[in-house]
Amino acid sequence: MKLKFNVQNKSQADPYIFEDNGKFYLYVTAADGVEAYKTDDIFGEWEFLGTVCTVENKINYWAPAIIKYEDRYYLYYSCQEKKGQQNLHVSMANSPEGPFINPKKLYDRFTIDAHTVLTKSGLYLFYTEDNLEEERLGSRLFLDKLSDPYTPMHLRKEILTPSFDEEIYQRNRLGDGRNWHTLEGAFYFKEDNVHYLMYSGGCFMNDTYHIGYAYSGEKLDDLENLHFTKFTDNGKFSPVMIKNEIEEGTGHHSVIKLKNEYYAIYHARDVKPETEFNDRTARICKLNVKNGIITAER
């Protein structure tokens, strides 16, 4: 189901949903700054708030994610200089509507797709960066710990790696015969003592682009010591969501729990668009989460 917006013909790529004081906010990828929406009802109309975060001389703001910490709001996103690479940044605000100010670059290397989590053991940052050493080289999921919202501890722990051809982003990307794989868009949550780590795999322009997940039943709050197992169907590729007869490019989502029900907010394109506009737009579906199993009702 598509979300409803009070503006037309706008993309909502990489949608991140956030609830605060009875209102819901959605932060999305955009070229000139992080854009945001708000609503009182996620199934009702969303109001466009405009651009809520920019950094001087930076472009291409990807995959924003927000956390409330000690009564302030911290927005994590990647951006780049015109001829540079994507680097994760953080900015802060006194309101979820922004403006988000005081930007800081967290890493000098290529890093994207943050998800910040607070547990009893502290603040953790899931993100994506590259590993060129393995056979299935490419972008993988990593974990860091934060001493505060602005200060990474540089654990650089790789926590999930590619294992399927469906996770190939581009064949022979570097010209050496090896295929580039991509895992991105990490989203972590815990339900009934099971840790879930959802992600997107592959290339968003390909039919195999999908949402999958890994899980751990370990009774730990220090996330750096968890060992995640990718969900499969007896070792075979088994995504939660992938292209169907209605939508394609299905991926990069966030999750919210409302009245004991889980929902994924994700982006996709229409297989049969009704207009010339067919960019990635935000959609919602229910997730069934139980005993280490996640299924989607689309």
Feature roles, as predicted:
Residues 1-298:
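Carbohydrate-active catalytic/glycan-binding domains of CAZyme proteins
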